Regions:
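C-terminal cap of metal-dependent C-N hydrolases
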Residues: 8, 329-340, 395-463
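Divalent metal-coordination and catalytic microenvironments
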Residues: 8, 21, 26, 48, ...
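Metal-associated gating/positioning segment near the N- to mid-region
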Residues: 49-112, 120
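Histidine/acidic residue-rich metal-binding segments in metalloenzymes
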Residues: 137-315
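Histidine-rich, glycine-flanked metal-binding segment
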Residues: 1-3, 9-53
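A glycine-rich helix N-cap at a beta->alpha junction
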Residues: 110-130
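Active-site mouth loops of central-metabolism enzymes
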Residues: 58-71, 99, 124-135, 159-162, ...
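His/Asp/Glu-enriched, well-ordered alpha-helical/loop segment
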Residues: 211-229, 233-238, 287, 314-315, ...
């Protein structure tokens, strides 16, 4: 079937166009002025809504199989579609078994389908593999089996089933990584600085319900030490290095210098680091806990400048949900641990909110939809190796699209959160920008309906072929 979507603002690599996007089957056939369309092509006029490429999240924790009570493919991909994402790349941890072998990868693939073999995913997806201590021999088989790249932690990841990797094991893994040509994504914090800070706080009998205590326990130095070590290894071995969820702006000078050297380095930050600040987090408000932590407002502004100048490449959600009891939000579920940042799960669920949160900040800074789609679609596609299929509105690419109202303003409520557990640090905030419709390969998968959001009855999401 051939049809067209017309918008006054079609956000393309060439800029914002008043145009019609012609869709043939699952792909974009052409982009042209609406008056040049053949009369026999059905056209839907989106009015003043902007037409954006479907967003791509390269940092999603779906937690299935093994921890479906945390999230799962069905709920995560619904939340993503409502948030304007048409692709997620699932992390290899927080699921059981962890995705560090081909056998575990196949178990995860099986979990994307129901008992009848039908997809549970409303949008498309790719999968990261894990690079952990003692399993270097599995990296090349995982690459051949189709993972998009590998994820490592330099520190305990917060739950059992996935181990951190030390420098010696990382150096053993690098030759395997180089042979695959795939990126290594790294949680860049080292434990020594955190241990010293935490021991000092405990010696002082610090109050762990205070956010400033938690912030002091994850000092900038933990990130700085890790990033310095990673850049040293990258400088020697020239493997593709991607630093996930950068929090500290103090690392920006060394990152910028490494990029000037030509190191194969990319960096992401997250909506919560770009929108929130330590100064606004109330004591006991564990819904704000993540690792690395949310830092100062001044730090946040430096992250924005780094996005503008290219030191930071892209924005990823780090969608990391958990059951409510694990967030230690209240005495009813947490008892004496209520409000303790040292006991609460460190993660923020963001798939439904990321676009509006980021766009709110873009509007405040005079930034454009063209810039936003680079950070949340084009560059994530490049990192995941799917840029020949998605990441922009261009002929030949999948017709993954979103109708977005950049002028809309709304107060975030629980009804806007479509993931399994509606916990969010943004509840009650006034945000800018609303997704009205999401198309996956030319077919509508989500329509905004207020409290009655409309999702496609038939999930058609599939895994990307990574070559």
């Amino acid at each position: 079937m051939v049809h067209a979507l017309r918008a006054r603002r079609v956000i393309t690599p060439a800029g914002s166009l008043d145009a019609a996007v012609v869709i043939e089957g699952e792909r974009i056939a052409t982009i042209k002025p609406a008056h040049e369309l053949s009369a026999d092509i059905p056209v839907r006029d989106l009015g003043e809504l902007a037409l954006l490429p479907g967003l791509i999240d390269v940092h999603t924790h779906i937690n299935e199989p093994g921890r479906t009570e945390w999230e799962g493919f069905a709920t995560a991909t619904r939340a993503a579609a409502a948030g304007g994402f048409t692709t997620v790349v699932d992390m290899p941890l927080n699921n059981l078994p962890e995705t560090t072998t081909v056998t575990a990868l196949e178990a995860k693939r099986a979990a994307t389908r129901d008992e009848h073999g039908r997809s549970k995913c409303l949008i498309d997806y790719a999968l990261w593999g894990g690079c952990v201590d003692g399993k270097q021999e599995h990296l090349e088989p995982l690459a051949k089996a189709g993972v998009a790249g590998f994820k490592s932690f330099l520190i305990y990841p917060g739950c059992d089933g996935f181990t951190e990797i030390d420098r010696a094991n990382l150096e053993r893994a690098i030759p395997h990584l180089l042979r695959t040509g795939l990126p290594l994504l790294v949680h860049a914090e080292l434990a020594p600085a955190i241990k010293v800070a935490t021991d000092d706080l405990n010696h002082l009998d610090a109050n762990w319900c205070r956010y400033k205590t938690y912030l002091a326990s994850r000092p900038d130095e933990a990130e700085l030490d890790a990033i310095a070590m990673l850049l040293e290894l990258c400088r020697v071995h020239r493997f593709r290095l991607h630093i996930v969820h950068l929090s500290t702006a103090k690392a920006l000078p060394m990152i910028a210098a490494a990029k000037r050297e030509g190191l194969p380095l990319t960096v992401e930050t997250c909506p919560h680091y770009l929108h929130l600040s330590a100064e606004q987090i109330a004591d006991g408000a564990t819904q704000f806990k993540c690792a690395p932590p949310i830092r100062s407002a001044a730090n946040r502004e430096q992250l924005w400048q780094a996005l503008r100048d290219g030191t930071i490449d892209l924005i990823a959600t780090d969608h990391s949900p958990c059951p409510p009891a694990m967030k230690k939000l209240d005495r009813a579920t947490a008892g004496d641990d209520a409000g303790r940042f040292d006991k609460a799960w460190g993660g923020i669920a963001s798939l439904s909110t990321a676009l509006s949160v980021v766009w709110t900040e873009c509007v405040a800074r005079g930034l454009t939809l063209e810039q936003l789609t680079q950070w949340m679609a084009a560059r994530p596609a490049l990192l995941a190796g799917i840029h020949a299929q998605v990441g922009a509105i261009a002929p030949g690419l999948h017709a993954n699209l979103i109708a977005f109202d950049p002028e809309a303003s709304f107060t975030l409520t629980h009804e806007d959160l479509h993931y399994r557990h509606p916990i969010s640090p943004y509840l009650g905030e006034t945000l800018r920008g609303r997704v009205h419709e999401t198309w996956l390969r030319g077919s509508t998968v989500y329509q905004f309906g207020g409290s009655n959001a409309i999702f496609s009855d038939a999930a058609q999401g599939r895994e990307y072929a990574i070559s």
